[in-house]
């Protein structure tokens, strides 16, 4: 007999994961539903009113913040080296360098080395074989084995570092998936079958979205833009990429980290959330790209901060710890954080689990109406975790007047949430997306809501898979911190625990992150992700990321493939 665990409050019904997986497999075998409207796709392609903002910053390669860059391979040069410089000429990856006027080589940049793959793909450039004195050796870097976990593998961490440095995906590292054995790691795109049938129109094209494009007609880059308001009223807001930054409050991360994220969001024409810790004045120049969050603790919530922004988010629950409320331990509550939150310095802060003023959809609607009365130009987002009845929650938020439903599954968060909560309470996001998408279609309201997904979104491929399952876009967080060289050590809850100055409020450690450096690293990562999304769309013969929504026919479940 299976053990059933009930969580008081949000998860009103127990979740049986075997049942969820069975329903999920059936969904992947079903016909696509809830596809985007033709006129919306056409708008994304033409941008007639100029609502889709341009991306204003280009890739600018940036070195890591610290002298010792983590690497997968270690390159060593023995005393047998005669400094002939042949390796400098041969290596196309910049591992070796000898400044003009010097006879000696500089120490090799091991992080640029692609290891044995070089011998396989570029034998004429493989330094180990070409060195006249056999002075070069390449071996696995010992610290590589200590990095990461099954969800964020060492390869995925290093690949994200490299994309944040160069704006391009590294060929020698696995940057698409992790090794968790579940979640998005068990889902793959069926590119091979689509390459065979490229002349066949996709279902979205057959619904009148234009003629299918062959190889010779793909002259324009696919659009990655999505709308954030599908209601017939309210401001029409588009973002040029299908993601924005999730809530990380002042206190959970440093002000420098918040500034880095805000500047990157502005450069990419998208948004980033303040989290529940208030709205620091340093973010005021980025008002048009900020989402201010109203959570159950109401920390730092003021009418003037609601009036500053274009999107206001109600956080009813967090996928990493649903039913537990927000936690900020005493170490991180410095004088500035306490002032922002209206609390006492070095006292732990706990948000209650529910809004004690909301016990029905009608109460929820009063919240939404309050925001609209305070700021008529703001869109309203509702962030919920993923209980078994999350589909009903989403419909309730629709009737309360929300523009955006933000589903937050388990495995999200920076590391401060208890592991037992992250791994055992919320429904995984890949199960929640189809459940909500399908129910909204059945209710006839899918084309009036924007469905954003978060909770373990690590890569551009995760974003694309979430959209193919039925989401409109994704909300990201940890990946941005990894771009700032987070190594996922898990010390986020401590005031001086983060050695990189990311998730800390210590005034000295915070200075390790220069906002301009951090912003450009995130911008570079975003460029790499967008390029990967464009490649995915081109492989599938799609003109817009909007065409990918609900297209489960381009996905395959890895367990299913093993069965055949």
Which residues are covered by each model-predicted region?
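Active-site cores of enzymes that catalyze phosphoryl transfer or operate on phosphate-rich substrates
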Residues: 313-366, 373, 388
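Aromatic/His-enriched, Gly/Pro-containing loop or helix-boundary segments
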Residues: 105-123
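Secreted/processed peptides and extracellular or luminal domains of membrane proteins
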Residues: 87-93, 97, 119, 124, ...
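Glycine-rich phosphate/ribose-binding loops and adjacent secondary-structure elements
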Residues: 1, 69-73, 83, 88-89, ...
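Electropositive phosphate-/nucleotide-binding environments in soluble metabolic enzymes
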Residues: 78, 85, 121, 125, ...
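Conserved, well-structured core domains of diverse proteins
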Residues: 2-74, 79, 95-111, 128-203, ...
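Anionic ligand-binding catalytic core segments
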Residues: 509-528
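Glycine-biased, low-complexity coil/linker segments
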Residues: 207-211, 215
